[in-house]
Amino acid sequence: MNDSVTLRTRKFMTNRLLQRKQMVLDVLHPGKATVPKTEIREKLAKMYKTTPDVVFVFGFKTQFGGGKTTGFAMVYDSLDYAKKNEPKYRLARHGLYEKKKTSRKQRKERKNRMKKVRGTKKASVGAAGKK
């Protein structure tokens, strides 16, 4: 990352309950294209003396005219806390979660089996379909 790119944190908060530091992040990049999230993660990890795998950045919007991008960042104390608290789609972006995909036919068969029963019995029919 170039020296012309600056990271500024706003609204910094240490969230002890979720074992993370969360902040609004301003990326100043005058005359440059939007900075990739991987580079932002690496620079934040260096700032907070941790590894890039526990840094999650998201929700970036570039200001009209460029030069400034604003988003959110979370730095977890450990990878276990990150896996427990981050949504699955964000973990998948980092390569930490793989969704198991059932075939279309299996999904349809399960749906049709569940249509035949009512109420709380649906859970047992749905669980039987997951085997």
Swiss-Prot record:
Disulfide pattern: none
Location of region: Disordered: 93-131
Main subcellular localisation: cytoplasm
Family annotation (Pfam families): Ribosomal_S24e
Keyword Glycoprotein: no
Gene3D superfamilies: 3.30.70.3370
Signal peptide: none
Keyword annotations: Cytoplasm, Nucleus, Ribonucleoprotein, Ribosomal protein
Keyword Repressor: no
Domain of life: Eukaryota
Subcellular localization(s) per the UniProt record: Cytoplasm; Nucleus, Nucleolus
Composition bias, Basic residues: 101-121
GO molecular function: structural constituent of ribosome
GO BP terms in the entry: ribosomal small subunit biogenesis; translation
Any one GO CC term of the record: cytoplasm
Similarity comment text for this entry: Belongs to the eukaryotic ribosomal protein eS24 family.
Quaternary data: Component of the small ribosomal subunit. Part of the small subunit (SSU) processome, composed of more than 70 proteins and the RNA chaperone small nucleolar RNA (snoRNA) U3.
Role: Component of the small ribosomal subunit. The ribosome is a large ribonucleoprotein complex responsible for the synthesis of proteins in the cell. Required for processing of pre-rRNA and maturation of 40S ribosomal subunits. Part of the small subunit (SSU) processome, first precursor of the small eukaryotic ribosomal subunit.
Protein name: Small ribosomal subunit protein eS24
Organism per entry: Ictalurus punctatus (Channel catfish)
Lineage of producing organism: Eukaryota, Metazoa, Chordata, Craniata, Vertebrata
Gene encoding the protein: rps24
